[in-house]
Design a protein with these regions (language model features):
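Core segments of small alpha/beta cavity-forming domains
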Residues: 1, 45-147
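Repeated scaffold domains used in trafficking and secretory/extracellular systems
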Residues: 5-13
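Functional cores of ribonucleases/endoribonucleases
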Residues: 11, 148-190
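Short beta-strand elements that form the blades of beta-propeller/WD-repeat-like
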Residues: 14, 19-25
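A short, structured loop/turn motif at beta-sheet edges
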Residues: 15-17, 164-173, 196-203
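Short glycine/acidic-enriched loop and turn motifs that connect beta-strands
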Residues: 27-31, 182
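Low-complexity, intrinsically disordered terminal/linker segments enriched in charged
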Residues: 34-45, 184-193, 199, 206-237
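A mature extracytoplasmic/lumenal domain signature
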Residues: 131, 177-181, 208-210
Length: 237
């Protein structure tokens, strides 16, 4: 059943070797509405790849975190902001409503580490090094991003697509992922390999990410507020 119909004149179009058809809608000079770029996958993806994408990659995506745009492994988490990851884990655990903008929270050590260690094989020592940890009260400081000051998501960014996978002998699975960016007409804005450890009871852990190819810079990522800037924005709350 047809629920939406939109007719337009195309300004440009391109078909790629990987089976994508990109099209740009014509807009007159001075137009200030939604983007006119569209991407259509003509060559269908393997059903298993789509399932893997929905389960492991889309929950993080590329918005306000660098989990899939940085190189890291269980031996080296450099380049990853643990608070960005924690934000996404809270969303996956459906606990985002517990925290409000402009407030400082002290999360008990066990609670913070339990959420992380459910999805990552990471020690408490590493987590404490990359966060603000208060030894005397055994808590992690946590502040959400602010809608006004450091949230600022860019609406037109790439989206991930798992195109193949390898089941490894050690019980992990490596997903080959292409970042599709309609606004740039790129079906491989960058490519990365994500290794997942499969556990019992449908559980899993992220093991590593490796960016194998990139044609772009990650210009849409917004850094979290520094302590000084946070006090300037929210100090009176």
């Amino acid at each position: 059943q047809e629920t939406y119909y939109h007719e337009f004149r195309a300004n440009s179009w391109k078909y790629t070797e990987n089976g994508y058809f990109f099209m740009e809608e014509y807009h007159p000079a001075g137009y200030d509405g939604p983007s006119g770029y569209r991407a259509f996958r003509v060559v269908p993806l393997n059903k298993k790849c789509r399932e893997l994408n929905r389960k492991y990659i889309l929950p993080f995506g590329y918005t306000l975190n660098k989990l899939f745009t940085s190189n890291w492994s269980e031996k080296n988490y450099d380049g990853i902001n643990f608070y960005d990851v924690f934000d996404r884990l809270l969303s996956m655990e459906e606990k985002t409503d517990e925290f409000k903008e402009g407030k400082t929270y002290e999360i008990p050590k066990e609670s913070f580490e339990t959420i992380f260690q459910k999805y990552f094989n990471i020690s408490a020592e590493i987590l404490q090094t990359g966060t603000v940890f208060h030894t005397e009260i055994q808590t992690y400081r946590y502040r959400t991003r602010g809608i006004v000051y450091d949230f600022a998501p860019t609406p037109y960014i790439p989206y991930p697509e798992v195109v193949s996978y390898i089941e490894n002998q050690d019980g992990t699975i490596t997903l080959e992922v292409n970042a599709v960016w309609p606004q740039k007409e790129l079906d491989q804005a960058f490519c990365h390999s994500v290794t997942i450890r499969l556990l019992d009871k449908d559980r899993f852990q992220y093991v590593s990410n490796y960016v194998s190819r990139s044609e772009i810079e990650v210009t849409w990522y917004t850094e979290r507020l520094s302590d000084e800037k946070w006090e300037e924005c929210y100090g009176d709350n």
